[in-house]
A protein has these predicted regions:
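Glycine-centered hinge/linker elements that transmit conformational signals in sensory
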Residues: 178-184, 216, 228-263, 312, ...
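Conserved C-terminal helix/tail region of periplasmic/extracytoplasmic solute-binding proteins
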Residues: 391-519
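Long, aromatic- and glycine/proline-rich binding clefts that accommodate carbohydrate-like moieties
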Residues: 134, 308-316, 360-417, 467-472
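Extracytoplasmic "Venus flytrap"
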Residues: 35-52, 149, 207
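Hinge/lid segment of periplasmic solute-binding proteins
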Residues: 30, 97-152, 174, 192-197, ...
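Extracytoplasmic/periplasmic substrate-recognition and gating elements
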Residues: 56, 61, 85, 134-140, ...
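Short, solvent-exposed loop/beta-turn-alpha elements that line the ligand-binding surface or hinge
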Residues: 114-127, 198-203, 220-244, 296-306, ...
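Extracytoplasmic "Venus flytrap"/periplasmic binding protein-like
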Residues: 57-128, 158-164, 171, 272-273, ...
């Protein structure tokens, strides 16, 4: 009996061991770590290569492989929207333009980061950048600043020196206008016969249009939107201060200081003309400065004309409310559906001070870290930019901003369309355009509050901004502005020859008809 009992125990023991062995969890084996994917946009020259250099150090440190996917800005919105809404093929960490953060946050598609704020340390970042990490009036943080896109006046040092123009000469709007006239009046031509012009900017075919208007509007106390008495956002396009700032910016074209040829170009084309040494001033991102230090084979501008001429960054000329430049940039975020703890580790790695310093120096954008910016202040070409962060402004962080920005693009495009033919310029038409799109902004904000500015009130502010006085017959005329010469008209993009020919033909036709009738 004892033998039988012992035999049964042995068999049972073997069976149980076999069962447990069969069900042993495979996790005991070394787990294979998935790679982490980062989505970015084209930041500076060779964006993928530059980020991969930083991520190589991360892989060396952690053993986790990474993959960088570069999305063109034109496709980025749709790709990101699809990935975040569906959760299919979404990245682990992604770059978002600062104005995109509120939209995806409001949809619950990017992960709240408040739990990790001690590791992030908000006090490290400049306020204007940290304010873009969340929705306006909300305390939930959804992203971490990566770099700052600040847009100052960029000046060609050689052209300024040739015309004896100093930085303090263009500190005010009137001073800037005088400098523009001085360069235009010099009638300089380059070796290839190209005329040097003072200032140019893109218009109706460019998504940067609101960014171009914003500094001149903000510097005169205006804004695209504002809160009403109930604390709700509403359109502010037809407020006197906004109108004043818009008129000041349009005056560059109305006073033939800027060629209407530029109105057919986009930002890339304008920058190309600046890089070719054909423009004294543009308003653009600071990356151009860094590119002049990078060899051409690496995507830089070191051996180009602008590399030889050199670039100087200057504040936006002061308006009635000071000098306020546009500030944008990009933040890093994690999709809500991402369950990898390593994704947060990678985000923290990319936004630590060491990496912010190294990466921004490669792409030429400003870092958002106060400590890193202190070092940048020692750079002769960048030190003028750092103080601008204290007075510059970013767009209001609301979910509707993306749609509002598209409305603003359409509005300013319509205005530029109207200004293409100077003879058809009409204040009534400008007012009509602003009123139409102001109503569209209010509709998007679900605010039915009327702007209340009558045409007479609009006209009064418009004339004040453009230095227009009324004659006894109530016919406006512009003062303090000399009549443009034929050369200035040609420089502005207006060619009088076809008009003279057309008028001559018309007069000849009328004269022939009269003679025929007399017979």
């Amino acid at each position: 009996m004892k033998v039988v009992t012992k035999l049964i125990c042995i068999i049972t023991s073997i069976a149980v061991s076999t069962i447990f062995a069969a069900k042993a969890p495979q996790a005991k084996q070394a787990a294979k770590q998935d790679s982490l994917t980062v989505w970015i946009m084209p930041n500076g020259a060779s964006p993928q290569e530059k980020l991969e250099q930083r991520l190589h150090l991360y892989t060396k440190k952690t053993g986790i492989k990474t993959k960088v996917v570069v999305l063109d800005w034109g496709e980025a919105w749709n790709r990101i929207t699809t990935a975040l809404s569906s959760g299919v093929d979404a990245p682990d960490v992604l770059q978002l333009g600062t104005t995109w953060v509120p939209y995806f946050a409001s949809r619950g598609e990017i992960k709240p980061l408040n739990e990790w704020l001690p590791q992030i340390d908000p006090s490290r970042f400049v306020p204007v950048s940290w304010n873009t990490t969340h929705i306006d009036s909300d305390t939930t943080i959804y992203s971490v600043p990566w770099f700052i896109d600040i847009r100052p006046i960029l000046a060609n040092k050689r052209i300024l020196k040739k015309n004896n123009i100093k930085p303090e000469d263009i500190a005010t709007f009137d001073g800037f206008v005088k400098a523009i006239r001085k360069v235009n009046d010099s009638h300089e031509t380059l070796d290839d016969g190209t005329k040097v012009r003072a200032f140019a900017f893109p218009s109706k075919i460019d998504w940067n249009i609101p960014h171009n208007f914003a500094p001149w509007m903000w510097s005169n106390g205006g804004d695209f939107i504002a809160k009403d008495q109930e604390g709700k956002w509403k359109a502010n396009v037809l407020s006197p201060k906004t109108i004043y700032g818009i008129a000041k910016y349009l005056s560059f074209v109305l006073d033939t200081l800027v060629s209407t040829d530029a109105l057919q170009m986009n930002t890339a084309q304008i920058v190309q003309h600046f890089n070719a040494g054909e423009l004294a001033f543009i308003v653009n991102t600071s990356e151009v400065i860094m590119q002049t230090r990078i060899e051409g084979e690496k995507g830089g501008l070191l051996n180009t004309r602008i590399g030889n001429d050199s670039v100087m960054a200057l504040p936006i000329p002061k308006g009635t409310e000071g000098s306020i430049c546009f500030i944008g940039g990009s933040n890093l975020a994690i999709p809500t559906g991402n369950k990898k703890p390593e994704a947060l580790d990678l985000l923290l790695y990319l936004t630590n001070d060491e990496n912010l310093d190294a990466y921004t120096k490669q792409i030429g954008m400003l870092p958002a870290s106060k400590k890193v910016l202190a070092n940048w202040s020692k750079d002769d070409d960048y030190k003028t930019l750092v103080p601008m962060l204290g007075t510059g402004r970013a767009y209001t962080a609301i979910p509707e901003w993306g749609d509002i920005e598209q409305i603003l693009v359409a509005m300013f495009s319509a205005i530029w369309d109207h200004l293409e033919i100077p003879a058809l310029y009409s204040e009534e038409k400008i007012y009509e355009i602003l009123t139409k799109y102001s109503n569209e902004i209010n509709k998007r904000l679900n605010n039915r509050t009327p702007d209340g500015l009558t045409f007479a009130e609009f006209r009064e502010t418009w004339h004040k901004a453009l230095n227009i006085k009324e004659t006894k017959k109530n016919t406006p005329h512009i003062t303090k502005q000399p009549a443009p010469t034929t050369e200035e008209l040609e420089d502005s993009g207006f060619n009088p020859t076809p008009w003279i020919f057309a008028i001559a033909v018309l007069v000849g036709f009328i004269f022939a008809v009269i003679r025929k009738k007399k017979r």
